[in-house]
């Protein structure tokens, strides 16, 4: 009963969070409809082979051959036995609520836990949770299907709560919270978001250090730091399998450093990613106003003609053109929506800079500024280059605009610290009233100026790319269209400027009513909560709304087979590849649903495969399209050995070609080398550049090109004859069996992608795999008949799983200790009360 009485308000807040989350998704959640996410729908094919194999065998394969010729599945819905227990704990944490509903619920609950750790009263903590959770970006990523990112962001505030508790001297609670939520965080599997929030934690720890130095409590600071480190290590240990294999995989992907020495070395970073690639999605400098004015740059990249209110100003003669132009006019290539943290929240943040005292304020301000400067990316390259070159791991992540998640955390937190100061010390509104006016002027004042004189502060409402595109129109149309388009977009902009102005004015009025004692503090908090919730709810409904939800059957329906798919699937050969030339080959996974594709889509494909795409595969695709078209599909008239040798070595047995009317046709490639073949010779080279160049200079059917470091494994081959045969007799994605017959022996090249962790046996005896032709596996066998098996069951899985289970044991022990300490504490309190 005492427990219920103590935590009743907290329980009511949690129930309110669940209700708010349900209501946002009504009526879709009541109808059982689900979000049609393009990313999820397009990704069906990516993991289809993995899912089928698991259904048929009960085994989880760590390799699939369905995309990019073959790649690990570590970043395709990663699943490890040790994570099953953690997954059940996670489900309990979000109260087994349905999808989408629980995403918003854990946003709310996580920030609430953190604010309670900061010693906020329940009502203020609930308000703070609303303004953080309803930040627009968090709903935009739900709509886009970036669910791992959703989870990662939701678990970071409660993880920080553990850090806060530890530095407040509550070591055991801090340890448990840090351990549990760092485990949740790592399992969420979005390293980029976790990495960005480490900057927040770093600044906060510096603030705690400054406070400890001031108070002479360095020993306490050291103890708290140790507690946080131990908690983080426990959380990491529970996810060691995922972490280790993600790290290992990362070394081999586009996020790892390339062995190629490129001519344009200045554009390269230590991670191997190009600077242009990393900064492609950079927030515009003037786009930063979206933090306070959501449509400062028009919102999302949707057709302008969809905005009915804006189109009231459109010239009817140009409506067709506006179907082609986006509502967004910023300098990003495109966007699903802006980063909006709330207009009145921005005012409270500015006010917090004046009235909140202590090092934590400066830590939050520094993190906010850092976040904004880094989000500018290519628009502020000196600063960006410094981080790319000197800050560990920063160059491994693209879409730098997403680092604004830091500002989306720090702005609401400092805003809530300001409101807490006002609630705890009401007299501050009288003593520091000039700061309230200043904060109002710096926020509502700018909104008013922008609304009245938009052209003075923002001269361009048409992007550079749009201006260039419009130059293709007849000269007499360009000026009227530009003028009308500018008027339309000014209307979009000024509408939201007025909107933000009124929201800040209403919020400020609530503060003034509290100052004049015409409104109690709880009523003021409730009023601000309603104001901010309505404000941000309405903005979020622009990007995540009911019409985006469909019947579950519509999304979960298996991908329909085309006639082309049916024809290719009649081929009963165990393993071959398909190249879809009728699609955006390297930006789709539909082909992978039924076939082993040369193409695919994954943000972290193997680096060497990408380099082969750039150097050989893409050029061969163009030549293939041209040659097959000129031959009218008659492959006997195509010189396949010289036109597409790399596609042949990848055992590309079928090309899918486009026809008129959106139809396709399969064309069989008679030049494909098959699953494996003996070569006459191995040419050894000294580096990656020589290796990738050498692939284009030899007859790959007879000669293999290998780095000299594989000379010990592969040695040399011998000239072969027609009696040398390699035949695949069993196929599993993670286990391939071949029957080999050869009177001479030598080097066998497999049309399979080389990756560390694959092992080979010949007649059940282990042999070392080598890498040839830049991306393929190879072994050397002796003369005779042999059974060769290639297998992918990395030993590292067993080792990391064992460590994870040890971590579980430590966590359970800590929980038992925590319960014991709490019981002992209550007994002492009860005994003291009796005395």
Regions found by a protein language model. Give the residues of each.
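Contiguous transmembrane helix-bundle modules in multi-pass membrane proteins
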Residues: 129, 145-156, 166-183, 191-193, ...
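Polar, glycine-rich mid-to-C-terminal structural blocks
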Residues: 223-283
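Membrane-interface coil-to-helix junctions
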Residues: 18-114, 130-153, 267-341, 374-384, ...
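Extracytoplasmic/lumenal acceptor-recognition loop(s) of multi-pass membrane glycoenzymes
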Residues: 54, 59, 65-69, 76-79, ...
